[in-house]
């Protein structure tokens, strides 16, 4: 059970993740067997907006060609548990950015982004890899 998550881009940028969703699906035949290759792999994130004038995510979103590599690290408070779960992505575009602020709530300003990656890897050292054909 993850208690914290961080979105990291190399050694330069890091954001605290509040929500993370991703999904992969396969088409199926009438009998329930797979009928094609898996698709999907969009990563939907809600991160705490930085307090400074950080425009890293905005710059990424505004570019139709800028690709980033990064990772989402899910950690637990109990250090006795195994190493954290890591989702790595490569050659990714930011295809959606939405910011939310409400002065009447105690919730910090949030940034929602959707990432479309050519490759998503899971497991120890990326032992399971999902590849999108972005030709």
Regions found by a protein language model. Name each.
Residues 1-135:
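Glycine-rich, low-complexity intrinsically disordered segments
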């Amino acid at each position: 059970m993850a208690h914290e998550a961080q979105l990291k881009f190399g050694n330069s940028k890091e954001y605290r993740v509040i929500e993370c969703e991703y999904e992969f699906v396969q088409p199926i035949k009438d009998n329930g067997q797979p009928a094609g290759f898996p698709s999907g792999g969009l990563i939907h994130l809600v991160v705490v907006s930085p307090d400074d004038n950080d425009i890293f995510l905005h710059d990424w979103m505004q570019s139709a060609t800028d690709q980033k590599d990064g990772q989402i690290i899910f950690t637990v408070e109990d250090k006795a548990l195994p190493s954290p779960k890591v989702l790595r992505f490569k050659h990714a575009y930011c295809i959606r950015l939405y910011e939310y602020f409400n002065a009447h709530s105690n919730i910090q300003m949030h940034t929602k982004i959707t990432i479309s990656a050519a490759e998503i890897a899971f497991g120890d050292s990326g032992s399971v890899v999902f590849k999108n054909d972005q030709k």
